A protein has these predicted regions:
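Charged catalytic carboxylate motif
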Residues: 42, 84, 206, 288, ...
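Short conserved AdoMet
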Residues: 51, 266-267
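Short, hydrophobic alpha-helix immediately C-terminal to the catalytic nucleophile
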Residues: 44, 114-118, 290
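Active-site helix-initiating loop/hinge in glycosyltransferases
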Residues: 35, 77, 284-285
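Conserved HGGG/HGGXW glycine-rich cap/lid loop of the alpha/beta-hydrolase fold
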Residues: 21-69
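Catalytic histidine-centered segment of alpha/beta-hydrolase-like enzymes
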Residues: 277-286, 290
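Flexible "cap/lid" subdomain of the alpha/beta-hydrolase fold that forms the substrate-access gate
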Residues: 2, 16, 22, 57, ...
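Alpha/beta-hydrolase fold catalytic core
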Residues: 1-31, 51-55, 93, 99, ...
Length: 300
């Protein structure tokens, strides 16, 4: 099938730039959500692999690429991100309360997907999360686990007012560094670097506003008690959608403790740990990811 690009304007005024593959009349519908600091193009190969039997849509979430970029960080709170996804699902399925077959999400896209699955489970038949912490687990680990607190220190840099300028400096050197902990990885080809550069050149503050809007960040000092006082109601963390979690175990930002006790919030969750893969498992081991997604789609 041929990749298509389009803009989807939602009823509440937000426009999402989208990429899609697969026939419009395919028997299955799949939506794929990006993570920081990427963009929807990272799903192109995945969509091509699934397209023979599925209509796949990968939106750039608000704040990313050519999608609407509200200036106020408050516009990136979960209720607004979930509203975007609910409206996109309605536009994709042809009506409200019609579910998609599979929602696939990585990193910040996973944050949106966890919230949607908790608040509107009727819209998703199956969920696949890729290296994205459940909000309840993230709160617990940021509050109680020194290893995760240390691993998440980078968040404090992302919320700085000058973060966009700092990350854009020297041809986005700091952003490219997030993709390549020990030197440029083999998957980060010159063509892919050019795609990242083109997206980042359209603005970074929208993507950074996800971090600015979130209360889930490590304490800034022993006196910082914000996380101790934060309570997430069960209604926003309990997920009753069949869920598969794919997890690259060499993720230096998201430590393994984030998987502990996940079944308490997500009954029946299936967890596939992948040794030797990092946060960027979709790029590092695409064949393995494709197979897990095909399995999830076949189970619907």
């Amino acid at each position: 099938m041929a990749l298509t690009l389009f803009d989807q304007t939602l009823p509440h005024g937000i426009t999402l730039s989208c990429r899609a593959d697969g026939p419009l009349d395919a028997p299955k519908l799949v939506i794929l959500l990006l993570g920081f600091p990427e963009a929807a193009f990272v799903w192109d190969e995945v969509m091509a692999a699934l397209a023979p039997g599925a209509r796949c849509v990968a939106p750039n979430l608000r704040g990313y690429e050519r999608s609407s970029q509200p200036v106020d960080p408050a516009a990136y709170r979960p209720k607004h991100l979930v509203a975007d996804l609910v409206a996109l699902i309605a536009a994709t399925t042809g009506g409200p309360d019609r579910p998609i077959d599979l929602l696939v999400a990585h990193d910040w896209g996973g944050g949106v997907a966890w919230n949607l699955a908790a608040l509107a489970p009727q819209l998703v038949k199956r969920l696949v999360i890729i290296n994205s912490p459940h909000p309840g687990a993230l709160l617990r680990e940021l509050r109680d686990n020194p290893a995760q607190q240390a691993a998440s220190e980078y968040m404090l840099q992302l919320v700085r007012p000058d973060a966009a300028a700092r990350f854009a400096a020297d041809d986005f050197a700091a952003l490219f560094a997030t993709l390549s902990r020990n030197g440029p990885p083999a998957w980060l080809t010159p063509a892919l670097r050019a795609q990242y550069r083109a997206v980042w050149s359209q603005g970074l503050d929208g993507a950074l506003n996800y971090y600015r809007a979130s209360p889930l960040r490590p304490p800034t000092s022993p006196a910082d008690r914000a996380l101790q006082q934060l309570v997430l109601p069960r209604s926003v963390v309990e997920v009753h959608v069949p869920t598969t979690v794919l997890w690259g175990e060499d993720d230096h930002a998201l430590r393994p403790g984030l998987l502990d006790g996940l079944a308490d919030w997500v009954p029946g969750v299936q967890i596939h740990r992948r040794p030797g893969a990092s946060h960027w498992i979709v790029h590092e081991q695409p064949g393995w990811v494709f197979e897990r997604l095909r399995e999830a789609l076949a189970a619907v």
